[in-house]
């Protein structure tokens, strides 16, 4: 709307003709930064901290790895953007373009060890988030999510951006910690086991019991889940 509004004025000033009346999703003047420090003892020790930093270095050095590294970060960011009625596609486009436009590496995050051996993580990406107008102001679910976050309207867009970036940083920490220890497949398999438990009709405490027995069996399948559920209920 703003681009279309100023187009005639620009034509008058320049004597030219305006063709594209649209803004860019590369919002470099609306970058948001979040950082945190985790003591090594809360992550599993110094070896895990070193493993996370090595995984980060791999992402910095290899385009195939950084694609998955950054995608994992967006696994955390996108749901919050969607839940609050914002445009996740615009945020995705801006973040990925910015990662290649900026100087240095293409990772959205940076990880380093502090002097006392703790792990410090930082994320900085464009975050064109809004709270006035659009679905955020009209969609009942989006309004409820914003209320849960206790973000003020108007004036809370910067705070919401910080929340979203913090989620992305924590998501990346979780993924890198898993990769630096037992591997990410173990966590995925645990989630798959729980989903199967619910799918075959497990209720309440049965879900955790069934999921654990499924993992122990090494056969995380629907038919095995049904068999174990029947045994639990005997």
Put a short name on every predicted segment:
Residues 45, 49-52, 74, 88, ...:
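Alpha-helix initiation and N-capping motif
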Residues 1, 11, 39, 151-152, ...:
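General structural signal for secondary-structure boundaries
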Residues 1, 12-15, 19, 26-28, ...:
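Metallocofactor- and cofactor-centric catalytic cores in central/energy metabolism, strongly enriched
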């Amino acid at each position: 709307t703003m681009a279309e509004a100023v187009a005639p004025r620009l034509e008058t000033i320049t004597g030219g003709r305006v063709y594209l009346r649209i803004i860019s999703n590369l919002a470099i003047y609306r970058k948001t930064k979040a950082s945190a420090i985790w003591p090594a003892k809360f992550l599993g020790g110094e070896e895990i901290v070193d493993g996370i930093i090595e995984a980060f270095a791999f992402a910095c050095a290899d385009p195939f790895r950084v694609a998955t590294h950054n995608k994992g970060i967006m696994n955390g960011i996108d749901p919050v953007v969607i839940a609050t009625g914002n445009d996740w596609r615009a945020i995705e486009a801006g973040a990925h373009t910015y990662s290649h436009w900026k100087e240095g590496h293409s990772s959205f995050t940076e990880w380093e060890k502090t002097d006392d051996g703790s792990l410090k993580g930082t994320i900085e990406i464009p975050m064109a988030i809004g709270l006035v107008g659009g679905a955020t102001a009209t969609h009942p679910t989006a309004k409820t999510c914003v209320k849960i976050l206790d973000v003020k309207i108007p004036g809370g867009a910067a705070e919401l951006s910080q929340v979203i970036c913090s989620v992305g940083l924590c998501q990346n920490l979780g993924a890198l910690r898993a990769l630096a220890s037992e591997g990410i497949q173990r966590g995925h398999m645990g989630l798959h086991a729980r989903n199967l438990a619910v799918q075959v009709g497990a209720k309440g405490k049965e879900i955790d019991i069934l999921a654990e027995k499924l993992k122990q069996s090494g056969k995380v399948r629907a038919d095995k889940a049904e068999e174990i559920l029947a045994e639990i209920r005997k």
